[in-house]
Swiss-Prot record:
The keyword rRNA-binding does not apply. This is Ribonuclease HII. Endonuclease that specifically degrades the RNA of RNA-DNA hybrids. Transmembrane segments: none annotated. Pfam families: RNase_HII. The gene is rnhB.
Amino acid sequence: MTKKIDSKELPPFEYPQGYQLFAGVDEVGRGPLVGAVVTAAVILDPNNPIEGLTDSKKLTEKKRDLLFPEIQEKALAWSLGRCEAHEIDELNILQATMVAMQRAIAGLKVTPDFALIDGNKVPELPMAGLAVVKGDLRVQEISAASILAKVTRDREMEVLDKEFPQYGFAKHKGYPTKAHFAAIEEHGVISEHRRSFKPVKRVLGIE
């Protein structure tokens, strides 16, 4: 059984010395069978702090929705990036995530000196970068990015749900749940489904 890591057990993050502007970068949507992988990059303003930043998955939907506009308003810069389902199929999910992160950073109106990436892999960037394991719990910039990315993708799934209510996207957000599998088996796949993912391949008979 995997032990859940409490943020209090994690070592405090030490920011690399000699840099001024840090961008936090995170992604949402690597696991779902449908839709884009969405990324965000955020440079926070030390003179305009935001209370309550943490991993977006640890916050209620209501709290995320409250923080979403506050981050956009108070950050020095923020940007969203994405790779669509067809790009994920062409590249693979890891490479597509790296590209989406590159797009988020490239979209920042202020150029950061250093990029802090949640996870264990840094995409090729024009500035220094560091992968931070559990960064969404340890680094406020990454926490802010995780909230922007999650709220954005969740809202996209709610829009898709209105177009295709039979799939239940608003509930499971495209993740591989029993309800999602059952809907695919009954109704087939839509253009937003990731055809390179095994459960989708199975329904299409292209395993």
